[in-house]
């Protein structure tokens, strides 16, 4: 594995909140990136801060469903992309929900674990 991440592009919230069924007023902050060429790479990354832990749990469910759907899609065209998606962990810490789909997904997610824990600790 090269460990490289595909070139990512930021997606405006209005383009995907309705698609995912995300309630904008319940999200304090968010970033969502997908591969510039989604037909060749399933790489994506998301960090969301919900207004409360209850909605964070809802976001966690939404993203788990997305990852499952992406995996099913990839299964038909690329075992490599499928494996990458299947190994993705959706993480929740307090009001934060985040994940990274990448060959380096595990390492990048660990970095987010400690970064977000630090933000929460600062309160």
Which residues fall in each region the model found?
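A short, solvent-exposed beta-edge/loop patch
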Residues: 37, 49, 80-121
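Sec/Tat-exported extracytoplasmic proteins
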Residues: 2-3, 63, 67-71, 101, ...
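Stable alpha-helical elements in mature extracytoplasmic
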Residues: 12, 16, 55, 59-63, ...
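Extracellular, surface-exposed passenger/stalk and repeat segments of large secreted bacterial proteins
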Residues: 1, 12, 58, 118-121
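Mature extracytoplasmic domains of secretory-pathway proteins
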Residues: 37-68
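Subset-of-secretome marker
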Residues: 2-13, 68, 106
């Amino acid at each position: 594995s090269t460990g490289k991440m595909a070139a990512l592009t930021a997606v405006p919230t209005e383009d995907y909140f309705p698609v995912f069924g995300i309630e904008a007023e319940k999200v304090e902050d968010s970033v969502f990136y997908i591969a510039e060429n989604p037909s060749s790479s399933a790489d994506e990354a998301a960090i969301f801060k919900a207004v409360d832990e209850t909605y964070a749990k809802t976001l966690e469910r939404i993203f788990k469903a997305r990852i499952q759907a992406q995996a099913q899609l990839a299964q038909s065209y690329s075992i490599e992309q499928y494996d990458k998606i299947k190994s993705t962990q959706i993480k929740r810490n307090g009001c934060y929900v985040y994940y990274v789909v990448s060959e380096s997904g595990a390492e990048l997610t660990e970095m987010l674990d400690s970064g977000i824990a630090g933000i929460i600790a600062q309160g």
